[in-house]
From Swiss-Prot:
Name under which the protein is recorded: Cuticle collagen 36
Single GO molecular function: structural constituent of cuticle
Secretion signal, residue range per the UniProt entry: none
Entry keyword annotation includes RNA-binding: no
InterPro entries reported in the protein's UniProt record: Col_cuticle_N, Collagen
Composition-biased stretches (Low complexity): 231-242
Amino acid sequence: MKIDKEDDQQQQMRRVAFFAVAVSTAAVISSIVTLPMIYSYVQSFQSHLIMETEFCKTRARDMWVEMQVLHKSGVTRSRRDAGYKEGSGSGGSGSGGYGGPTGAGADIGPTCCPCQQGPAGPPGPAGDTGPNGNDGHHGAPGVPGKEGSILSSALPPSEPCIICPPGPQGAVGQQGPKGPPGPKGKSQERAADGKNGEPGMIGPPGPPGGVGEPGPPGPAGQPGRVIQVNGAAGPAGPRGVKGPPGPKGLPGIAGLTEIGGQGPPGDAGGPGPVGGQGPPGPQGPQGPPGDEGSCDHCPEPRTPPGY
């Protein structure tokens, strides 16, 4: 049988089939490599998210417990005298775009926060006075002034001044205002420490620590002692192993000479030997006709392309 050469359409279809198989193979290989990586990343992200969620829950529970402890203790905090903006009901905005702190006059309604944390408390008391700042640098020299000139007096000429004797001393004037602080001294001695502040409140108990390392082995104990105690009798033990047969007994008394009656039937005998082969049986009836034959098992005939 003569096979014709492939035409252009068949060659084009072959190229398309080869390209499709190559793309499918590459997609399968990339999915085999990419899916485990994506699964590992998602699993690690889920584990990290669960850890962060548990940590957030723990911190929120600790803060809630601390708020309850502070509420039960009844500790009040006073507002600071300076350094904070006066509070208002709406919370005004401060410099830089940040809201000012809420004062005691703020109207805080009963709200429920998802993080179980209340609003910010009032400002604390004023801190200690800070140390004096360093002296500033000297300023630049000023511009020289204009030259003065003698002007004629606009007042009429006065009588010649008569030198009078000094009068009595006047009364003592009021004390003047306090002058500015002087420059920083050059003494190398350290100033005295300030007084200690009041002790703070006891914080909540910290989280339990990790399991410590096992300690060194302890000293050896004293050797044991056997103490004899006469207790009650225990239960009977299990039955022992059967012993060996005893010695042969003495000969018995001679039997009677009379004939006894018929004894009981004996045990059944064993199976007999296999019997010989029997004669052949008669011929059986004729069987039904078989199925018609088919060509399913035959290979397909080879035909030229395009047939």
